């Protein structure tokens, strides 16, 4: 009987107008070098709104854009120090977590997006597992589009680029390896966040960048020519720290996966479409398209194949390069 009265008094003591406490809002901090008002971020914010709506505002992604969190190597360091929970990265940043991923960005590897999509789909499960083993959750792939040379002066063959100062993304081992295939040029190593500055100040003559990025980063005033064909494919992805992702309620994890499955493929399609539109739009800024001689393209392909082999054991294992090349060759045969 005594316990009955204790229970009764406890129940009576609860105010009738007591409110149920709302769920704690979880904030995920994400860093990227992508400019705030770019097409890339416009796509990402659609994904953000989906997450917010599906979780009734209880899960929020806060993006530190425009390099506020630093260049990609600095973003990686912030992830390690738990100052960030996730990141939107290019292949350069992804490669600092899992260097194997750079096999998808080898120069003159892919001819079109169909080849990209096919090969990436075949090795994506393996790469996801490797990211997991490094403490990261691969949320979804995105695109930068194909990457082109942009130059202050016209060139159609290798002899015309001799002595030119070419920007190389600082601390990017793949970009540095490219200089082995271009002994004629003078590399200028600098952060991508300072690229506009050194371009405007005349410190470099040639850069490599996706067309949509040239517009987003406002690099068009510093160059006059876009050189075709593209030299490589630009990879991108959204990753989260695995411990952060694993700590989320299961329903939130499912929302993130659902959002990635729904929005990221559209993100990729839009970026690819806008890449083509960007090349046309750059004409309005006086940037002319120049095509390399066929003999030059052939020579560059041969040079870059030596770069592929030189990166075995440094960026990726032999078996992975073999798998990518054989998968690509098989796709080309089947598509004929």
Which positions does each model-derived feature cover?
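Sec-dependent N-terminal signal peptides of Gram-positive bacterial secreted proteins and lipoproteins
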Residues: 7-11
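N-terminal signal peptide c-region/cleavage motif recognized by signal peptidases
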Residues: 13-15
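N-terminal secretory/targeting leader peptides
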Residues: 19-115, 131-336
């Amino acid at each position: 009987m005594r316990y009955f009265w204790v229970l009764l008094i406890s129940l009576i003591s609860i105010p009738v107008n007591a409110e149920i406490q709302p769920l704690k809002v979880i904030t995920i901090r994400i860093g990227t070098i992508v400019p705030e008002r770019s097409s890339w971020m416009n796509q990402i914010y659609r994904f953000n709104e989906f997450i917010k709506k599906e979780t009734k505002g209880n899960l929020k992604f806060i993006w530190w854009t425009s390099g506020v969190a630093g260049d990609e190597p600095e973003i990686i360091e912030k992830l390690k120090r738990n100052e960030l929970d996730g990141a939107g990265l290019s292949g350069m940043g992804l490669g600092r977590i899992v260097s194997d991923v750079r096999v998808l960005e080898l120069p003159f590897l892919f001819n079109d997006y169909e080849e990209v999509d096919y090969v990436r789909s075949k090795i994506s499960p393996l790469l996801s597992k490797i990211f997991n083993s490094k403490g990261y959750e691969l949320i979804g792939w995105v695109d930068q589009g194909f990457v082109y040379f942009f130059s202050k002066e016209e060139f159609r063959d290798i002899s015309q680029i001799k002595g030119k100062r070419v920007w190389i993304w600082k601390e990017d081992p793949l970009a540095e390896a490219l200089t082995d295939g271009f002994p004629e040029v003078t590399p200028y190593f600098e952060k991508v966040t300072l690229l506009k500055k050194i371009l405007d100040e005349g410190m470099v003559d040639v850069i490599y960048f996706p067309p949509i990025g040239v517009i987003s980063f406002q690099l068009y005033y510093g160059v006059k020519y876009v050189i075709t064909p593209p030299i490589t494919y630009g990879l991108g992805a959204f990753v989260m720290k695995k411990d952060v992702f694993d700590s989320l309620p299961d329903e939130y994890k499912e929302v993130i996966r659902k959002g990635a499955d729904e929005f990221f493929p559209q993100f990729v399609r839009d970026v690819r479409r806008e890449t083509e539109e960007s090349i046309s739009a750059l004409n309005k800024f006086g940037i002319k398209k120049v095509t390399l001689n066929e003999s030059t393209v052939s020579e560059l392909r041969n040079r870059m194949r030596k770069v592929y082999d030189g990166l075995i054991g440094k960026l990726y294992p032999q078996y992975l390069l073999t798998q990518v090349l054989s998968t690509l060759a098989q796709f080309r045969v089947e598509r004929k």
